[in-house]
Amino acid sequence: MARKTPIERYRNIGIAAHIDAGKTTTTERILFYTGVSHKMGETHDGAATMDWMSQEQERGITITSAATTCFWRGMDQQYPETRINIIDTPGHVDFTIEVERSLRVLDGAVAVFCAVGGVEPQSETVWRQANKYGVPRIAFVNKMDRAGADFSRVVGQIRDRLGSQAVPIQLPIGAEDNFQGVIDLLRMSAIYWDRDEQGMTYSETEIPEELKADAEAAREEMVEAAAEADEELMDKYLNEGELSHDDIKRGLRQRTLNTEIVLCMCGSAFKNKGVQTLLDAVIEFLPAPNEVPAIEGLLDDEETVVTRESTDDQPFAALAFKIANDPYVGNLTFFRVYSGVLSSGDAVFNPVKGKKERIGRLLQMHSNQREEIKEVRAGDIAAAVGLKDVTTGDTLCDPSNKVTLERMEFPEPVIAVAVEPKTRSDQEKMGQALGRLAQEDPSFRVRTDEESGQTIISGMGELHLDIIVDRLKREFKVEANVGAPQVAYRETIRKQIEQEGKFVRQSGGRGQYGHVHIRMKPQERGEGYSFESKIVGGVVPKEYIPSVDHGCREVMEEGVLAGYPVVDVGVELYDGSYHDVDSSEMAFKIAGSMAFREGFMKADPVLLEPVMKVEVVTPEEYMGDVVGDLNRRRGTVQKMEDIPNGKQIRAQVPLKEMFGYATDLRSNTQGRASYVMEFEEYHEAPASIADEVIKKAS
């Protein structure tokens, strides 16, 4: 089979946004106008095509990023058919991991902002992640029809808060109830959509007289931004004072692909305005798979770096970015093909697990409807049925050309709860179900508490764990009782010390002998653990050194102060001794763990607690109560800003004090304030808190 769509006509994009910016509605409209879905789904009726798990429909938020394929030829059918693969990403902070995962496999993104709410904390998180992966993006300021909508304020926030050079290529005509259409600054014309036709048809006219001056000024800015793309354009602009239509597009495209600028557009997806112009911009200004840097990977020797170009004639390489469980088909592995061709029935190798698996069926997803396909090629996004041992972030490659594409990094969970099955029959099912969910979602962990025998699940926030428990009930029919949330503390040290560890057992028969001297030192926050051997002259034989490291790691996992993992400690093994007969790996492991445990308690140990970034939006009259409440929770207020109809307060608050905050905020403000929080960093816990935690643990 030959390729249906040339790779330069592909666009792999994500639509990312804050929780209420209207992302799902925007995606819905894109599917409608591209002719895939014939009835528009509305999120607030719980009928949107993209939101396919029942919890999403009930809560009206998007949890799992589904991948959908659609085709677009332009508003005026001016382009050859372009294939757009859309990955829907969740906007809720607890699902940041899903966003990170999607951004990893995208080539470009559309960031949707609410014209009223503007840049919110989650927007900042998504922006940081998009910067990390170097994803070119376009901003779509949605909900221009809502009271309080203000396009220029949002553009200003993209500049100030997100630190990006925002370049409008459209201006709104009117706002709020009076939002009528947009001014296209490239064509210098006004575009109005036909309300009776659900926006399927539009008319293009002259710019209204009263907006001409604004449009001229904004166009000037846009042309200047385009001219900065390269010297040739700059010279042309300085000499002629203007650039041609094609030059402007070329300059804007080049700078968008280099992530130097963010083009800003506006509309109201709900009112069917501005979506087709957004689709045109996706084709004009976002990259094809062969216009982004080729992905890098490691060969089998784990040292040689190779690239895989986006072409069909390179060996097959793909990245699994999502595992989902489908009630009809079973396990679905969503993957992005970076190079080569794969047909159903082919074998693939998973270097991360060291296993070979055969691909059963290949499916192209349209939200929750699916079409079976025979093959996938470079640039495609599809789902495979029946892969058993693949987890999110694994590479799938040609068994005779092994390569490991970059692994994704996943954040550590900050909150944990104990879950207990209600009946004995739930017991077995619960273990299997939690295992399946952990395979789907790397930011969710399951472990068994050795002392109490309880099952502890941990994740990125209360909503994250609520949804996991909800899925246990719905998808796996497991009833469970859930304990109170617990904070995921960490332990570390404040000063450098030296410590000896000696394990000797020599009574008849083969004895045990391990003896080490280690230096322990605190590391920067977030630096993690490091182990270095400074052994000279073989006082500890080479083969025993990894065992000392192993012993230290074991203690770090168990914790010393209060049973929480130890972080940010550097260990140097600098001396020791051994016995020709009695020394063994086991003896040195125990000596290492003894030294670490004893040394830790002498190195000024402290407990660290997770601190959250909290942002509250409240009507002005409740501001005093809200700030007072945050202070009572050991919060430090960092910034207060005026926003339309109220105040925005940013604070840092320890997670321990935030349990039940939603209920208190509701009663303090009669339900008129809202808040979002996300993990920021670990801080030293005050002595009173630490003592309480340590006492509880002993």
From Swiss-Prot:
Molecular-function GO term, any one: GTPase activity
Disulphide bridges: none
Gene Ontology BP annotations: ribosome disassembly
Subcellular location: Cytoplasm
Chain ranges of the tr-type G domain: 8-290
Gene Ontology cellular-component terms listed: cytoplasm
Positions that bind GTP: 17-24, 88-92, 142-145
Keyword vocabulary terms for this entry: Cytoplasm, Elongation factor, GTP-binding, Nucleotide-binding, Protein biosynthesis
Chief location: cytoplasm
Family membership: Belongs to the TRAFAC class translation factor GTPase superfamily. Classic translation factor GTPase family. EF-G/EF-2 subfamily.
NCBIfam families: EF-G, PRK12740.1-3, PRK12740.1-5, small_GTP
Function comment: Catalyzes the GTP-dependent ribosomal translocation step during translation elongation. During this step, the ribosome changes from the pre-translocational (PRE) to the post-translocational (POST) state as the newly formed A-site-bound peptidyl-tRNA and P-site-bound deacylated tRNA move to the P and E sites, respectively. Catalyzes the coordinated movement of the two tRNA molecules, the mRNA and conformational changes in the ribosome.
Alphabetical list of PANTHER family matching this protein: RIBOSOME-RELEASING FACTOR 2, MITOCHONDRIAL, TRANSLATION ELONGATION FACTOR G-RELATED
Protein name in the entry: Elongation factor G
Species the sequence originates in: Halorhodospira halophila (strain DSM 244 / SL1) (Ectothiorhodospira halophila (strain DSM 244 / SL1))
Gene behind the chain: fusA
